[in-house]
């Protein structure tokens, strides 16, 4: 999927990795019902629900070196297929969201249309204003941040 898409799609993919729609979301838990299991030194008894968290997966340094950096180029070249296994904002496996490709296409078209029709300039915005600091059910900037402020001018066509 990702290995054959243009740079703008890689930017979109980088964005949904670094700032997922719902970082607290996780896969539907599976229940360990076959045998007691040991995971990283922890005993996991039979009947224990097991799941994963999007945020912890997307910010795991073992999967994504420099996880806090927005780096669309990580989705280019060799190793891309391996990274795709850890990109889970749409879930994974048989229960993966069927709208994944549509969502990415909509993001790319929206951004392209926005930049084609408008000139955008950051206004009184620093990196501190956009670093995600609060995570519960949605991605949010820090409580002191006014968010991203932008001056918008219509482009003459």
Swiss-Prot record:
<dbReference type="InterPro" id="IPR036396">
    <property type="entry name" value="Cyt_P450_sf"/>
</dbReference>
<dbReference type="InterPro" id="IPR002401">
    <property type="entry name" value="Cyt_P450_E_grp-I"/>
</dbReference>
<comment type="pathway">
    <text>Secondary metabolite biosynthesis.</text>
</comment>
<keyword id="KW-0408">Iron</keyword>
<feature type="binding site" description="axial binding residue">
    <location>
        <position position="97"/>
    </location>
    <ligand>
        <name>heme</name>
    </ligand>
</feature>
<comment type="similarity">
    <text>Belongs to the cytochrome P450 family.</text>
</comment>
<dbReference type="GO" id="GO:0004497">
    <property type="term" value="F:monooxygenase activity"/>
</dbReference>
<dbReference type="GO" id="GO:0020037">
    <property type="term" value="F:heme binding"/>
</dbReference>
<keyword id="KW-0349">Heme</keyword>
<comment type="function">
    <text>Cytochrome P450 monooxygenase; part of the gene cluster that mediates the biosynthesis of terreic acid, a quinone epoxide inhibitor of Bruton's tyrosine kinase (BTK). The first step of the pathway is the synthesis of 6-methylsalicylic acid (6-MSA) by the 6-methylsalicylic acid synthase atX. In the biosynthesis of 6-MSA, atX utilizes one acetyl-CoA and three malonyl-CoAs as its substrates and catalyzes a series of programmed reactions including Claisen condensation, reduction, aldol cyclization, and the hydrolytic cleavage that yields 6-MSA.</text>
</comment>
<dbReference type="GO" id="GO:0005506">
    <property type="term" value="F:iron ion binding"/>
</dbReference>
<dbReference type="InterPro" id="IPR050121">
    <property type="entry name" value="Cytochrome_P450_monoxygenase"/>
</dbReference>
<dbReference type="InterPro" id="IPR001128">
    <property type="entry name" value="Cyt_P450"/>
</dbReference>
<dbReference type="Pfam" id="PF00067">
    <property type="entry name" value="p450"/>
</dbReference>
<protein>
    <recommendedName>
        <fullName>Cytochrome P450 monooxygenase atG</fullName>
        <ecNumber>1.-.-.-</ecNumber>
    </recommendedName>
</protein>
<dbReference type="GO" id="GO:0016705">
    <property type="term" value="F:oxidoreductase activity, acting on paired donors, with incorporation or reduction of molecular oxygen"/>
</dbReference>
<keyword id="KW-0503">Monooxygenase</keyword>
<keyword id="KW-0560">Oxidoreductase</keyword>
<keyword id="KW-0479">Metal-binding</keyword>
């Amino acid at each position: 999927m990702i290995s054959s898409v243009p740079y703008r799609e890689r930017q979109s993919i980088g964005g949904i990795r670094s700032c997922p729609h719902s970082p607290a979301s996780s896969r539907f838990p599976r229940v360990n019902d076959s045998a007691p299991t040991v995971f990283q030194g922890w005993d996991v008894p039979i009947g224990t629900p097991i799941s994963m968290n999007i945020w912890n997966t997307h910010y795991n340094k073992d999967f994504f070196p420099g996880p806090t950096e927005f780096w669309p180029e990580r989705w280019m070249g060799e190793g891309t297929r391996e990274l795709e296994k850890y990109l889970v904002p749409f879930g994974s496996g048989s229960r993966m969201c069927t709208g994944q490709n549509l969502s990415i296409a909509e993001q790319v078209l929206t951004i392209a249309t926005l930049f084609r029709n408008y000139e955008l300039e950051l206004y009184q915005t620093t990196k501190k204003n956009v670093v995600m600091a609060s995570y519960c059910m949605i991605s949010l900037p820090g409580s002191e941040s006014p968010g991203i402020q932008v001056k918008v001018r219509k482009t003459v066509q």
